[in-house]
Each structure stands twice: as C-alpha cells, then as structure tokens.
Amino acid sequence: DLGGSKIVIGDGPDRARLTGLYDDTRFLGYKFGRELARHLAGADVFVFPSKTDTFGIVMLEAMACGLPVAALPVTGPIDVVRQGTTGILDQDLGRACQRALALDRENCRQYAELHCWRKSADQFVSHLAPRTPLGLEQPV
C-alpha cells in the first residue's frame, strides 16, 4: 500500500462498490477541461491500471499536465509511455509509482506536446495518398 492520498477521476458501474472497498480513496466522478487539468497538475503520479485499453489518451493528457505515468507493461501504455522518461511500466504498480515519483515532470510535458491534436492530424494527412478524379490522368 502506498502512502499519500488517492483520487479516482472518472465513473462507471463499479463506483459504488469500489467506494465501499477503498475508504481512503476519493472518487470524484468525471472531470473535464480546466478542472481536469487542475486535478492532474496537482497530482504526483498518474496511475493507469488498465490491462485492456488500446491507446490510453488519458496518459497523454496526464503527461501534458507534467504528470509521470505508472502503468502495466501492456498494449496501450507500451505505445504511449517512454520507459524511464515519461513513466514507469511494471507489473507491480506500487513499484511503478515509487519509481515514477523521481521522473522529471518537464520531460512529460515536452513528450505530450509531440502528440498534440495538431501534430497528430498533420501526421495523418502526410500518410494520405493523392487520388486522381475520374477522367483525369494527374492527381489534383
């Protein structure tokens, strides 16, 4: 068990059950925009316990707020987290949290900037092949 306060942002069908099991954890429900950013920026580590997410954009949102990530070494976190720079991937999330505390928050912010919506859109467009309209020989 880790010391410190634990906050869960988000919601789901198990919230009532989990609230009863973890009385030392605050369950805040969904947060958006500036309010979400404020909560993330005020934290020490973002714990991403999922074993099944395919990408995990919430990890990039946390990094954009300067928050290092502690996650399992599975698809999603493996694709997003730079091990030892923006987060720690470990089967033991407690150990991952402890190690993530030592990471430089500015590295997290800088890395997240590489994956902003604008840069992602530019990358997507750069992979599109030009199409030739019917009846024309050259792409437009």
Each language-model region and where it sits:
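Nucleotide-activated donor-binding/catalytic signature segment of Leloir-type glycosyltransferases, i.e.
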Residues: 5, 15-34
